[in-house]
Amino acid sequence: KAINAKSDNMRVAGKVVSFQTKLQQAVEMVIQVAQHFAGVDIIIVCDSWFGNNGLFKPLRTKLGNFVHLLSRLRSNTVLYSIPKIGSSKKPGRPKKYGSRLGSCAEMAAAFMAYASTYHVFLYGKYREVNAYSQIVMLKTLKCPVRVVWVFRKTQWIAIFSTDLKLSVEQIIEYYGARWKIESGFKEIKQDIGSSKSQTRNAQAVINHINFSIMAATIIWIYGSRLENIPERRHKVKGRNSFAFSDLRHIIAKSALSDDFHAVCNQDNKLPRKSFLEALLRMVG
């Protein structure tokens, strides 16, 4: 409503912001990034909500065959075989799809016994993963895709890629890396506080999210340059790596230390010093 009313608080750089759906925003951002990598294959890794023609078609139209999609398949998605190219010419246009193979869940049950073990670098270490791969036709994207069924003890997931050159290991590793992005969103929204912004101005909202992303990036750069690996404050079984909150605690502790005060000028003491110290302790 505010955008349609062309309110002053909906202006960015003096221009009124036009309404865009999530898919339209995603397409625009990917195209902006792709302009810096001309002639290079681009793989978009996303969840099943974005893994459809609403994202893929406009990207292919704008960027061509250099862009590929890697996403998760829904269990009820129907898959088809690759159409056979016959030597005999029949009237009408050639078939785009072969025979119906079944739903993703039906094929998972059929392929479970034929799964192979792959050595995949996943979540910080090499793991053995049982998976099965097959190239099929996907009607939602209207193109051939490589589907990888990953089988766990009691569950399974199906991942697909429009880039048929990718190996099974690469498809699993790329999709597994997506969860690092999910944790990054959590850090920016909850730990940094982006979701708690009280701004009502479009430009202020953009500035706030940019500063939040910058703050999270600086914290991780700081953590990568530490000589010793930080100790995890909240122990979790099976996890040895440190968390984002551990880095925040180290930075807050360092900012309140005598060494930090020795570097900073303490001659001009501000009346808000105690308040700033309280904020730093809260951050830690």
Region annotations inferred by a language model:
Residues 1-284:
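Single, function-defining residue in the core of a domain
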